[in-house]
Amino acid sequence: MGQHLWRPRQRRLPGILTRSPVGTKNQGWKDSGDAIVYEDGRAVPAPIATCELQGYWYAAQQLMAVLAWVLGERRRARELWRAARALKQRFNRDFWDPEERFYGLALDPDKRLVCTATSNVGHCLASGIIAREHLRDVVARLLAPDLFSGWGIRTLTTRHPAYNPLSYHLGSVWPVENATICFGLRRMGFDAETLRLAEALFRLAELYADDRLPETVGGYAPDEHPTPGAYPRSNSPQTWNASAMPLVLQTLLGLMPYAARHVLLVDPLLPSSWPAVELHGLRVGGTTASLRFWRDENDRTHTRLLEKDGPLHVIRQPPPEAVGVGLGRRLRALLPSK
């Protein structure tokens, strides 16, 4: 992907991404051989353009555009921004299913939309590729009972003929994926839904020794089984899964560092079980700091910088793309905590 982005003589960027000519058949995040299925349960043949891959391609172009601009490559930056805008328009045209009010899982080799309801769409919240007018429908669908188990969002809807609560990618719940979706919910301003998913993950962690989440768990709901069930070969500890809870914590506290400017944006959203949280040894650039976040008797959240060993400005601001956050709320967020 990096080679596509940074070839000085390349005249145009690819649009919808499918797959590399080498490697596994399924080259989205769900890379097992049976992970991408049509509505009737048949496996989709390669090449496949999964929805989440387009979102990460979109985000990569935007971030590389910023880098190009900073490095003085202004023409290249504008090309990347234009390509990102075009990709977002094409994605929302080709992947949106107006009947289901949801995005499809993928485009098959004939560019037909695979209208299977999966967790993959949640990644598109995090990357920002979803059109604003579709956000509420997408969030409601992700948290519907056939996808949201009560422990997390399933990889596949329970309504699908291929659903198996103990499969690797066809019904299980992945904590690392749910952390990504949690980040996307908060990024887009869905605070109540962010808390709902985060608290489900906390309850899930309590089932395991040392609150260590396994690689993946089953898709059983609490009213079906007292636990979500265990995927037979789930690893614990597991590398990428170890990032799940740190990302959830970052999401709930709204931490967004701008290290080069010695700035840390915060916007704490505390669950009912968290009256206060302290972070110690937080690095932002060359500065190490400690912060306290708490909720007062009126259910308002506050932040205090406890200590720092270098320059750092802590500023409260909601996520830049949050739906429904107007100028008034952003200005009020700048007022000091009492």
What is each of the regions a protein language model found here?
Residues 171-178, 188-197, 205-213:
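Active-site-proximal binding-pocket segments
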